[in-house]
């Protein structure tokens, strides 16, 4: 990774930044010179990721937060701005895709949890951070969606619907907060991270994708770096598929 996507002097707020693709993006942003504010539900996991960022010579802040809880998000944003004075890059990465037995057997509690984490929380965070970005020097918001929103299956219907709604929000907020704030979506397929260790071999092979494999972490962080950096200065309201050609 070179300094082509230089983020020196920038501050990135990454939800779900202590593991999986969020953790990979945290490290990539720091490697390009950004300071990072990391949030997830477990402060210990956030601190572990923050220690790695600091070892790279960058500053890191942490905050334990459940993005699904609207009331907690004001505190998260206040903590990030108190730590760094600004947020230049917001990555709405936190998400969950539990399987539902069937539409008729999906419990309301499960449905509400999925929608809150994958749609309602990002809506609130974009509102809070985007308005501050627009009042300041601008910035970049990156929403992490899912190939499931484009290729929905019955077992993930609530999740697919929530992510499809997130895709729509990307376009809406791009217009609301433009021209100073760019808002884009990355739509990932299956990626081999610490989360994938529980997958069986068939799932890892991803035979239904055109590339016949799951992605490597570095294959999504480059997309995130592009959207976070000035190299994407004429890109907003867009959805970037990084899914290996999933069918």
Functional labels for PLM-detected ranges:
Residues 146:
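Residue(s) in the substrate-gating loop at a strand-loop-helix junction
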